[in-house]
């Protein structure tokens, strides 16, 4: 590989020496950095149109953050819970080419001390909190608490949340969770973080309002593998460590990593929040009875526990020889973490300061004809999976028209 690297570099230097500037040795049309959803879709579509593509990923596996690993018959979401949902039929049909989806519906449960509440806030939640039975009673209760607080112009997140849902819901279900998520007290957080809190006056625990929802039977990794079938992929290959070879290997780069890192943090670091996961296999058949349980009190250090087997149900799940159910389950505790270089960036911090910093990088990128940035980190924006697909297809259309 080193020889190959030297020969290529040697050829390039030799041509420069002969001053044959019109000849460029380009082995690929596109180098795609990152094999997550954005990178894989671009690779798949470009390959279909006859383009020569190389995908590199610093991880030892494809899939980016939607990577799932089968452990003892259970598909484990390695980088946090991923539930696909969309109201866009075109996008739903697109993703269904690559896997069959089950009818999983996201209905998380929030645990505050030993009390359990349905999320998002709905009539089941209000009945458990106050014993109210009708939507009218629930509305009156919330309005009464909002009026008692008397907050006209919220100065921070705490005041904003209380002005939206009252003190009881805030204290039990919002405060601790949010403080853990952001690593700051709610009184120190800006009010704009919570623009609204979804409140439903119906008995419905479905978290999303979208028409289509589910999880691919057999996990997400197969989707990416099918997209990248027949395409050259190099794993455990860090773009920055192999930059000299990689940056002159293709006509154009599709970069799905952090835009600030690509430009050497020229204007300074963008801020992110990171996560830390602790996964364990337990000798019980069913640990918590739900895929996702949020822990809303501040004293519990993790924000949620995921029990992976509940994302997919059915005869094949966790079965062992003889058709018996495996007396095992796999859980993951999710801890929010301060991001520093070297840690995985999961959430972008789209406040005023970071938005303005990103616009400087975006300006640089717009003038750079060699590279296109895509995905959460490339575009410095929180995208749900369906929005990533929309962005990737839009990018392909623009690029290959």
Model-derived segments and spans:
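Extreme N-terminal leader/targeting segments of oxidoreductases
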Residues: 4-30, 48-49
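Mid-domain catalytic core of redox enzymes
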Residues: 12, 49, 239-364
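Short, well-ordered alpha-helix to beta-strand connector turns
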Residues: 28, 50, 231, 249-251, ...
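N-terminal Rossmann-like FAD-binding beta1-loop-alpha1 element of flavoenzymes
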Residues: 30-55
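Glycine-rich FAD pyrophosphate-binding loop
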Residues: 47-71
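Dinucleotide-binding Rossmann-like beta1-alpha1 core, especially the glycine-rich loop
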Residues: 72-147
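Active-site/ligand-binding neighborhood in enzyme catalytic cores
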Residues: 113-117, 123-252, 256, 261-263
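C-terminal catalytic lobe of FAD-dependent flavoproteins
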Residues: 344-401
